[in-house]
């Protein structure tokens, strides 16, 4: 029977795992048995103040564990742990009277304890455990719509499978909004804004109407987010502001241009700094880093990534550590540090996923799709996409084919492994759905991958009949993203490449090499931060120069091809190097 209600055990377990320490190791350092410490972590034994002090010292918790331990001979509620935003709101819920009596005393204390334990579980990645605590808080607050709304907001912060909609949570959010109807207090107004922001994001999670909740698809979610942002007061509560900006940015991610998304992220970072919440600070830093990358501001993103690394170290959050490592791997792939990326992707991330999946119940698809995307891109960069079809990775890609970006990626893999006819068939099926893509967000990397397929088919030759009808559509869809932007796959997973280069290879396939060269000149700005990307760009430039023709074009093309070949050799990009050597061996071919 669980007797611990203050979150000490959950926080102890989270910090121990974050420190990379086994249960036996910690037990030895704090002079108690492994079995007793296990029961403390599971909430079946109450820790003494002395044990809490020892654990705090060994794990360098800076008083956080001692603060959670009950004083000797008392059952006092410990001081709050800042495990996430909303702690202030959880401690100041003003409940309406219930049967003539205010909902205070033990009910209020238990509600706060359950929310705090849920926050600790959430930070540790224990999503099912967090849901259990939040659900208990919700049920215990029956008759108190404001408290129940706070509990449902916490539930809505949990990670969920990408591209899928949580229909039960949608119903809970709508139910809380209905219950607050008629409550004219300032607190209720803030809760309504937060609930609507989460509702908007959850509606927008669907990648298409096929995975949406009835008629409430992603476009409806984006519209609700826009309306909610419009009603957000400039001088309102910072917690409400942080929550609304966080959720509404995600809800509108696929429906607003990357520069507009960066503006929202910067507003969130300012609000999070005022709120001084570790949860929102992490959300803000990751949002800013993502949008800086999408806007081609690589060096600014490097600075933000450094801040996020410090945040992950300070909070000891398992989820923050996962996001920090995936962001590091993304940057390793961009800069050509393929060995470092491979160590994370094929070794460390697998351990991390198994740990989180087995012990913490994080939605596995959220983790596996991120790893899958990074594994795919590493294989592509190294010219090893054939391994995709000899491992279980191809099956994983096919299982996620409801995401168009995976269908586009599979078509590209087929083309780059010599299966051009099969790749063309899959490509045409994917292009048939382009009109259903949102205007931004995940649509951009999908379109860039489709442009890469066009380039592969164009270089192979013999596919003019397949390409001619679809090139205008692809060019029109990518045109709004031309410039210095970079297509970012995932949230974040990989940088697929400059959008201007994708526009250029489409122009080249359409028989407009001069236009292609203009696009390639724009693509050079974001590509300068990545030697592997520069090598790909020079190959594309060489092909365009040859097609333009004229005096000096062939020597210029040869120079570009040799530069691309040197870059490919330096970074072990065997497929790219083979393409360069093939074109060098056939003067005039483009």
Predicted regions and their residues:
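Short amphipathic recognition helices of helix-turn-helix/homeodomain-type DNA-binding modules
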Residues: 1-6, 11, 28-31, 35, ...
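Short linear X-Pro dipeptides
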Residues: 4, 10-18, 119, 126
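Alpha-helix N-cap/N′ positions at the starts of helices
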Residues: 4-8, 32, 106-113, 132, ...
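Short, conserved structural micro-motifs that define repeat-unit consensus positions
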Residues: 9-12, 22-23, 288, 414
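Internal alpha-solenoid helical repeat scaffolds
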Residues: 82-334, 340-354, 360-367, 443, ...
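Helix-coil-helix junctions within alpha-helical repeat/solenoid scaffolds
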Residues: 177, 303-311, 315, 325-590
């Amino acid at each position: 029977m669980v007797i611990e209600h203050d979150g000490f055990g959950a926080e102890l377990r989270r910090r121990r795992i974050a420190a990379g320490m086994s249960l036996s190791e910690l037990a030895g350092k704090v002079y108690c048995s492994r079995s007793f410490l296990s029961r403390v972590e599971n909430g079946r034994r109450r820790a003494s103040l002395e044990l809490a002090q020892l654990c705090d010292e060994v794990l360098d918790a800076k008083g956080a564990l001692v603060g959670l331990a009950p004083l000797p001979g008392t059952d006092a509620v410990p001081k709050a742990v800042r495990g996430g935003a909303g702690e202030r709101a959880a401690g100041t819920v003003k409940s309406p009277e219930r049967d003539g009596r205010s909902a205070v005393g033990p009910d209020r204390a238990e509600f706060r304890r359950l929310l705090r334990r849920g926050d600790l579980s959430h930070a540790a990645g224990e999503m099912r455990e967090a849901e259990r605590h939040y659900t208990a808080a919700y049920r215990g607050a029956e008759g108190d719509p404001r408290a129940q709304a706070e509990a449902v907001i916490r539930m809505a912060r949990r990670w969920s499978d990408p591209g899928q909609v949580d229909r039960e949570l949608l119903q809970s959010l709508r139910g809380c909004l209905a219950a607050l109807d008629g409550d004219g207090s300032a607190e209720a107004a803030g809760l309504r804004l937060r609930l609507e922001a989460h509702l908007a994001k959850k509606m927008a999670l669907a990648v298409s109407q096929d995975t949406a909740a009835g008629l409430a698809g992603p476009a409806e979610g984006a519209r609700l987010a826009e309306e909610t942002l419009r009603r957000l007061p400039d001088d309102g509560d910072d917690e409400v502001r942080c929550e609304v900006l966080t959720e509404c940015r995600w809800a509108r991610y696929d429906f607003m241009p990357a520069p507009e998304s960066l503006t929202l992220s910067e507003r969130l970072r300012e609000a999070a700094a005022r709120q001084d919440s570790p949860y929102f600070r992490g959300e803000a830093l990751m949002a800013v880093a993502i949008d800086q990358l999408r806007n081609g501001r690589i060096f600014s993103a490097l600075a933000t990534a450094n801040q996020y690394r410090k945040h992950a170290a300070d909070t000891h959050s398992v989820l923050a550590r996962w996001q920090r490592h995936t962001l590091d791997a993304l940057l390793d792939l961009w800069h050509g540090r393929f060995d470092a990326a491979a160590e994370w992707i094929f070794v460390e991330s697998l351990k991390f996923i198994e740990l989180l999946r087995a012990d913490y119940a994080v939605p596995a698809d959220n983790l596996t799709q991120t790893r899958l995307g990074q594994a795919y891109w590493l294989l592509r960069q190294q010219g090893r996409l054939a391994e995709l079809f000899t491992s279980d990775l191809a099956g994983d890609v096919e299982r996620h084919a409801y995401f168009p970006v995976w269908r586009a990626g599979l078509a590209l893999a087929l083309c780059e492994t010599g299966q051009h006819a099969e790749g063309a068939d899959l490509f045409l099926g994917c292009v048939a759905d382009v009109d259903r893509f949102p205007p931004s967000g995940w649509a951009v990397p999908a379109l860039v991958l489709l442009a890469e397929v066009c380039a592969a088919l164009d270089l192979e030759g013999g596919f003019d009949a397949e390409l001619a009808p679809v090139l205008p559509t692809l060019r029109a869809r990518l045109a709004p993203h031309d410039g210095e932007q970079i297509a970012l796959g995932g949230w974040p997973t990989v940088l697929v490449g400059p959008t201007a280069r994708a526009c250029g290879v489409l122009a080249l396939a359409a028989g407009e090499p001069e236009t292609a060269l203009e696009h390639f000149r724009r693509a050079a700005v974001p590509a300068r931060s990545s030697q592997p990307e520069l090598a790909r760009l020079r190959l594309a430039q060489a092909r365009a120069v040859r097609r333009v023709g004229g005096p000096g074009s062939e020597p210029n093309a040869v120079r570009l091809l040799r530069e691309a070949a040197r870059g490919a050799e330096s970074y072990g990009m065997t497929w790219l190097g083979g393409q360069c050597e093939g074109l060098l061996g056939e003067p005039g071919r483009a």
